[in-house]
Amino acid sequence: MILVTGGTGLVGAHLLYELTSSGLRVKALRRQQSNTAWVKKIFSYYTDQVEKYYSQIEWVEGDILDYFSLEEALKGVTSIYHCAAIVSFHGDDNDMMLNNNVKGTGNLIDAAIHNGVRRFCHVSSIAALGKTQDGSEITEETYWTPSKRKSGYSLSKFFSEMEVWRGIEEGLDAVIVNPSIIMGPGNWEIGSPKLFQSIWKGLKYYTKGISGFVDVRDVVKAMILLMDDRQFEQVKNQRFILNAGNMSYQDFFNKIADGLDKPRPRNFASDVKLHIAWRMAQTASFFTGKRPIITRETVSGTNQKNHYSGEKITQTIGFEYRSLDSSIADIAEIFLKDMVLPSGK
């Protein structure tokens, strides 16, 4: 039996679709307050048989911070896909994020070892990797180094990954994936899908940054292939960057705008403008009580120029990525349908 954590998130929901549409029954861990409606919504992007596949999920109430609920959830489980994590670039969330992501992963590792789980796939992030000084491509061997510029999210993903390496040292067979920025359809109000909504609503600015991007469908396909009987022994106890290609944020925004038939962002957001913007957002947040729409962390992230190599997995198991252009076009098409169908236009 397979257990998926974080099944209501972007990666987890797409993973559940891939597993159930392949005929597999799956356990999925969910907190009591979790809303599974988005899982069905994501299924509907790819099939008319939503209920057929959704019914193959056995939802198990639990929390990665509650070790004993994990013991119960892991009964009969031989493989785990760990997708659960809090993602935030608000400094106020750092303590909560570190506690949830690191302690939660540690709990799951301990429970997996105690229950004899045979295979474990951990969804880490490029945020858990280091940076190169000369601008060369970042690989699996580019190790994380402490820095005051690291975001709370980066810290949480690095130390979460360290929990997995600890588990490996204690005898757990595991594989780690480090996706770049994950593109995919889902809740258009949060995460990377929100970029499509922002451009739809007329985003006017772009930044100087460069980063890696990958389709969520490629992420889950890679995870399943890495856990497959035919290559797990070859790939276990390693990590793999999942990155289809590197692109400037300006090009990324332009491609989204073209896909949505919206104007391209024309104004360059300089360092000075961004610094003023996040300071003003922070001040406004103090008076309104609402969360700032831009933070020091988001400014830092969108200004960095990082290039990532996703070649290790292609060289190891022959994995092939979708092109970034086709991924953006597919997501834009789904977004446009979502914008039209709810209003019946």
List where the protein language model places each region:
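NAD(P)H-binding glycine-rich loop region in Rossmannoid oxidoreductase-like domains
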Residues: 44, 50-100
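Alpha-helical substrate-binding/gating segment
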Residues: 196-204, 211-261
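Active-site Tyr-X1-5-Lys
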Residues: 150-175
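Terminal hydrophobic/aromatic helix or amphipathic segment near a protein terminus
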Residues: 256-303
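Conserved Rossmann-fold NAD(P)-dependent oxidoreductase catalytic core, especially the SDR/UDP-sugar
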Residues: 94-95, 100-152
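NAD(P)-dependent short-chain dehydrogenase/reductase
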Residues: 168-213
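N-terminal Rossmann NAD(P)H-binding glycine-rich loop of SDR-like oxidoreductase domains
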Residues: 2-22
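Amphipathic terminal alpha-helices
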Residues: 310-318, 322-345
